[in-house]
Amino acid sequence: HAGTDFAAAGGTPIYAAASGYVQVAGWSTGGYGNYVIIYHGKMSDGNTYSTLYAHMSRTLVRKGETVRIGQRIGKVGSTGMSTGNHLHFEVRENGERVDAMRFYS
């Protein structure tokens, strides 16, 4: 299981971890349910980063939309392959999933 799961009540707001633009917003056939991917671009380390937010009860952004850090992008839910309300969060570096704990402060 790649990513970090955060238990939360259904409907709890989900906020963008960093500014960027919405690459994907919608339904996943791969088990994520309602999900959003935000592309954050190339950083000073030369790598590109994106974040993924999954199992939302509702998405509040659309593909192509620019979002700012802290903007509400969806609501916690249990869609897709999920057994209860939670946020599944992933960080991707150059398109590959990496340990999100590296980025928590």
PLM segments and residue spans:
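Secondary-structure boundary/capping motif
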Residues: 8-10, 86, 97-99
